Swiss-Prot record:
Keywords tagged on the record: Cell membrane, Membrane, Sugar transport, Transmembrane, Transmembrane helix, Transport
Purpose of the protein: Part of the ABC transporter complex RbsABC involved in ribose import. Probably responsible for the translocation of the substrate across the membrane.
PANTHER family on file: ABC TRANSPORTER PERMEASE PROTEIN YPHD-RELATED-RELATED, RIBOSE IMPORT PERMEASE PROTEIN RBSC
An example Gene Ontology CC term for this record: plasma membrane
Protein name in UniProt: Ribose import permease protein RbsC
Molecular functions (GO terms): transmembrane transporter activity
Family to which the UniProt record says this protein belongs: Belongs to the binding-protein-dependent transport system permease family. AraH/RbsC subfamily.
Superkingdom classification of source: Bacteria
Compartment list: Cell membrane
Keyword Transmembrane included in the entry's annotation: yes
Length: 322
């Protein structure tokens, strides 16, 4: 009897593991079929390219959020970091700074802002939710102070900067290429390096990781810095695409990123998840947004639908963790 129970439990664990890996792919496949049936224009090449451009920004933010959530943390400030770094990049370009240098400096600033989050959480012993909620408010305020609440325009006609957010390379949107390159680098970092193994170890059992010699504080600060850097990179892409910096940019982007991570199978309790799943989650959110737009659904109802999807994803995560 005990042997049968053990075999049944092993089968259940195996099934749960398979569903964790294949579930996001299956969800995306079903969603694409439904949207395609309701509006065949969804699969037109022009719309697919537009979809890839749209998901790039959320993709970059969600990749950083994946590392954060894998440690059992959360970062509510990513949208505010995007807005502040976007404004600073635009301001530098208007002041005559070379766009490439401005983007690099913007990413460094984003990493520093993320580092502040990491230090508040590790050295300040603050809960990630509270710490990043506070910095989100501060960064939003600094953005409004810097821009005086007005968009920053007059970014010039630099070809390279325009290409960064709106251009194509071999027929593929440059933002999508940027997202894919970031994905490859981060996949290697997470799955093929000691840093990635330490990230999983901290999320699985932080006390055990500390006892085993992992420098938890350093790893966490680096992870939040990485999340800030990727948010700033996303902000630079948005600035290029809009050819301006909006003081309200990035609002609710943190929710889309968290939704993508959870839909991709990463556990909110940490220690379990894959960046491949996050990429699929990003495509699910993007397909949902794009499909609802094609169907002419009001933006108000879109928020309701997105909220329901996030709720379902969290409930499924809790069920798996139980």
């Amino acid at each position: 009897m005990k042997t049968e129970q053990l075999q049944t439990e092993q089968k259940r664990i195996h099934f749960d593991g398979v569903m964790q890996k294949l579930g996001p792919f299956l969800g995306l496949f079903i969603l694409v079929i439904i949207v395609s049936i309701l509006n065949p224009s969804f699969l037109e090449p022009l719309n697919i390219l537009n979809l890839l451009r749209q998901v790039a920004i959320n993709g970059l933010i969600a990749f950083g959020m994946t590392f954060v959530i894998l440690t059992g943390g959360i970062d509510l400030s990513v949208g505010a970091i995007l807005a502040l770094s976007s404004a600073l990049v635009a301001g530098m370009i208007v002041s005559g700074v070379d766009p490439v240098l401005a983007i690099i400096l913007g990413c460094i600033i984003g990493a520093v802002l993320g580092m502040i989050n990491g230090l508040l959480i590790t050295k300040g012993k603050m809960a990630p939710f509270i710490a990043t909620l506070a910095t989100m408010t501060v960064f939003r305020g600094l953005t409004l102070v810097y821009t005086d609440g007005n968009p920053i325009t007059g970014l010039g006609t630099n070809y390279g900067f325009q290409m960064f957010g709106r251009g194509y390379f071999l027929g593929i949107p440059v933002p999508a290429i940027t997202m894919v390159l970031a994905f490859v680098i981060l996949w290697v970092l997470l799955h093929k390096t000691p840093f990635g193994r330490r990230t999983y170890a901290i999320g699985g059992n932080e006390k055990a990781a500390l006892i085993s010699g992992i420098k938890v504080t350093r790893v966490k600060v680096m992870i939040y810095s990485l999340a800030g850097l990727l948010s700033a990179l996303a902000g630079a892409i948005l600035t290029s695409r809009l050819h301006s910096a909006q003081p309200t940019a990035g609002e609710s982007y943190e929710l889309d990123a968290i939704a993508a991570v959870v839909l991709g199978g990463t556990s909110l309790s940490g220690g379990r998840g894959r960046i491949v799943g996050t990429l699929i989650g990003v495509l699910i959110i993007g397909t949902l947004n794009n499909g609802l737009n094609l169907l002419g659904v009001s933006s108000f109802y879109q928020l309701v639908v997105k909220g329901i999807v996030i709720l379902i994803a969290v409930l499924l995560d809790r069920k798996k963790s139980a």
